[in-house]
């Protein structure tokens, strides 16, 4: 049996880039909670003792940006300089302007257009992916790397591993078998965890705790064997972390946010963007399409692409590739997809309820992945029934 290795990585909520994603989405939540028609393009950057929120926001909401910055940093665990940032004493800078009137008239006609008339907020192409290798219909490499990161945060916050600090990264390599285009995981080849820690803990203690409290609860035993390689804090020291260790910026972790390198990516980031930004809403609807194709038994694995022009409601193109795993020809699956899903941005926002903010709705997406999550707020994960002729397939 010929196999190959594939790797995906993830980062914790305390990684500086992810901190920025979460602040940008916390701002989006606050705007949409008060004004569902808010137009938000919110970027965040961070470095030692400083967080800056900047971008273009048109909203009727009364938003305290500085409070959002401090609350988000505090919630992650950045409560003192020695962990990488002090939420209550860092500099919080704000530079927000209104959305360009040129963009506003072309996209939503200064809020005068009906939902079906609303144009894409920009040009671009987005991809959705699904695979039958996990119950979530997501790649195993991505699922495991993401869960390891989430588990690191869990054992830090519940006190199981008190030496942990907020920043951290994970990476998982899986050995796969290609079954006529479908991906079949055979075993976990390598597990890599680099986590921020305090001064008190030894490298041996770090390795033992990570194996017992993080890896063991996350990675199914059937995938681990005596040949599995573990790199646990291989640099030997990771005390300085968060924005103190590295600068952070919104939109720097787009592969972690999606499919861990599987499928494809159009390059657009998600966080801090309202649903007229097709970087986000377009990617969400094609995930729903790809997931529905696999869940309905039309294929074992597939990628769906959609593309847009600024100001134009209808997509320029829709593409489906099932990697040879389709039960019927891809062109027939494409026809079903076009009949089932409405790719116009205004309709995506309605059908996926993307104008509803608050209650950390989008903040939740900004760490540990936008896809494959079991949460009713992740409306794009709902499988739609697809009508096709199984008898003659």
From Swiss-Prot:
Listed binding positions for ATP are 15, 167-169, 235-238, 246, 252-253, 269, 273, 277
Protein location: Cytoplasm
Catalysed transformations (reactions) = L-methionine + ATP + H2O = S-adenosyl-L-methionine + phosphate + diphosphate
Task: State the UniProt keywords alphabetically.
Answer: ATP-binding, Cobalt, Cytoplasm, Magnesium, Metal-binding, Nucleotide-binding, One-carbon metabolism, Potassium, Transferase
Specify which residues bind K(+) according to the UniProt entry for this protein: 43
Cross-referenced Pfam families: S-AdoMet_synt_C, S-AdoMet_synt_M, S-AdoMet_synt_N
CDD domains tied to this protein? S-AdoMet_synt
Database matches in SUPFAM superfamilies: S-adenosylmethionine synthetase (SSF55973)
What family is reported? Answer: Belongs to the AdoMet synthase family.
Q: What does this protein do?
A: Catalyzes the formation of S-adenosylmethionine from methionine and ATP. The reaction comprises two steps that are both catalyzed by the same enzyme: formation of S-adenosylmethionine (AdoMet) and triphosphate, and subsequent hydrolysis of the triphosphate.
Annotated PANTHER family: S-ADENOSYLMETHIONINE SYNTHETASE
Q: What is this protein called?
A: S-adenosylmethionine synthase
């Amino acid at each position: 049996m010929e196999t190959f290795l594939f790797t995906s990585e993830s980062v914790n909520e305390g990684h500086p880039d992810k901190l920025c994603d979460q602040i940008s989405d916390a701002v989006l939540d606050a705007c949409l909670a008060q004004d569902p028609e808010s137009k938000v393009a919110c970027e965040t950057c961070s470095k030692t003792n400083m967080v800056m929120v900047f971008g273009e926001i048109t909203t009727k909401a009364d938003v305290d940006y500085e409070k959002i910055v401090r609350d988000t940093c505090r919630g992650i665990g950045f409560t003192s300089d020695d962990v990488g940032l002090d939420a209550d004493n860092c500099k919080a800078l704000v530079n927000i302007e209104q959305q360009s009137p040129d963009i506003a008239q072309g996209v939503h006609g200064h809020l005068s257009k009906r939902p079906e008339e609303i144009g894409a907020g920009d040009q671009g192409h987005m991809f959705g992916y699904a695979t039958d290798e996990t119950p979530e219909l997501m790649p195993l490499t991505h699922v495991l790397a993401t869960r390891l990161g989430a588990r690191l945060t869990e054992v830090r916050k519940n006190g199981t591993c008190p030496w942990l600090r907020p920043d951290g990264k994970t990476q998982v390599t899986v050995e796969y078998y290609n079954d006529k285009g479908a991906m079949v995981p055979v075993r976990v080849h390598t597990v890599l965890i680099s986590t921020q820690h305090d001064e008190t803990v030894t490298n041996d203690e770090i390795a033992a705790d990570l194996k017992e409290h993080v890896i063991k609860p996350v990675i199914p035993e059937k995938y681990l064997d005596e040949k599995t390689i573990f790199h646990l804090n291989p640099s030997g020291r990771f005390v300085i972390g968060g924005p103190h260790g590295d600068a952070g910026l919104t939109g720097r972790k787009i592969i972690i946010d999606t499919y861990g390198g599987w499928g494809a990516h159009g390059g657009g980031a998600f966080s801090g963007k309202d649903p007229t930004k097709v970087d986000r809403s377009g990617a969400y609807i094609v995930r729903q399409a790809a997931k529905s194709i696999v869940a309905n038994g039309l294929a074992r694995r597939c990628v769906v692409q959609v593309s847009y022009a600024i100001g134009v409601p209808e997509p320029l193109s829709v593409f489906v590739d099932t990697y040879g795993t389709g039960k019927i020809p891809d062109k027939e699956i494409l026809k079903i997809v076009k009949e089932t899903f409405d790719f116009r941005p205004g309709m995506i926002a309605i059908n996926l309820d993307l104008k509803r903010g608050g209650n950390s709705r989008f903040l939740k997406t900004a760490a540990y992945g936008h896809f494959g999550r079991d949460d009713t707020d992740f409306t794009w994960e709902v499988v739609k029934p697809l009508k096709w002729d199984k008898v003659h397939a």
